[in-house]
Amino acid sequence: MAGFLMKQMVGNQLSEVTGGLGMKDDGGEKTETGEDPEVIAARLEQEERRKEKHRKMENEREKMRQGIRDKYAIKKKEEGVAMDFTEGRIGGPRKTPEEIAAEMNAEDDSLIGQLGLTEQVEKAKTMATGAFETVKGFFPFGK
C-alpha cells in the first residue's frame, strides 16, 4: 500500500517535470498512419538514395558484362525473343492413340494397302498375338 501511494505521489510530480522539459506529447502534426511527415519524407529520401545506388551498381555490372562479351566475342541474348514451348515439349505435339490408329488403318496410303495384302497382314498379326499369349503363360516374365 505504501508503494502504491509513493508511486502516485512521485508519478504525478515526475510527469509535471517531464512536461516542463518539453517531453510532453502534444499530438502535433501526424498523418493518417500516425507518423510524422518529417519521418515519412526521410524514408522516401532514403528509398530514393537506395534505388539510385542500385541503378549505379547495375550500370557498372552491365559495363563489366559488356567488356567480357567484347573480349570473348559473345553475343548478347535478345530479351524480346521468346521460345514457343508446347507444354514443355521441344518437338511437335504428341499424337493420341486414336490418331495413330487412324493412320495405321489408312490402307490407301500404305504399301501393304496398295499391294492388296491387308488381309494377309491382319491374319499374321492375329496369329502372332495368339502365339504370344500362349507362350506368355509358360514364362514368368509374362505374369
Curated annotation (Swiss-Prot):
Identification of the protein by name = Putative complexin-1
The region called Disordered is annotated at 16-72
Q: What is its main location?
A: cytoplasm
- Gene encoding this polypeptide? cpx-1
Name the GO cellular-component terms.
axon; cytosol; SNARE complex; synapse; terminal bouton
| SUPFAM superfamilies, A to Z | SNARE fusion complex (SSF58038)
Sorted alphabetically, which keywords does the UniProt record give?
Coiled coil, Cytoplasm, Exocytosis, Neurotransmitter transport, Transport
One GO term in the molecular function aspect is:
SNARE binding
Identify the domain of life: Eukaryota
Q: What does this protein do?
A: Positively regulates a late step in synaptic vesicle exocytosis.
The residue stretches assigned to a coiled coil in this entry are: 40-71
Instruction: Say if the entry is tagged with keyword Ligase.
Output: no
The cellular location(s) given in this protein's UniProt record come to:
Cytoplasm, Cytosol
Query: Cystine bridges: which residues?
Result: none
Please state which protein family the record places this protein in.
Belongs to the complexin/synaphin family.
Where is composition skewed (Basic and acidic residues) in this entry?
23-33, 44-72
Which biological process annotations from GO are given for this protein?
modulation of chemical synaptic transmission; regulation of synaptic vesicle fusion to presynaptic active zone membrane; synaptic vesicle exocytosis
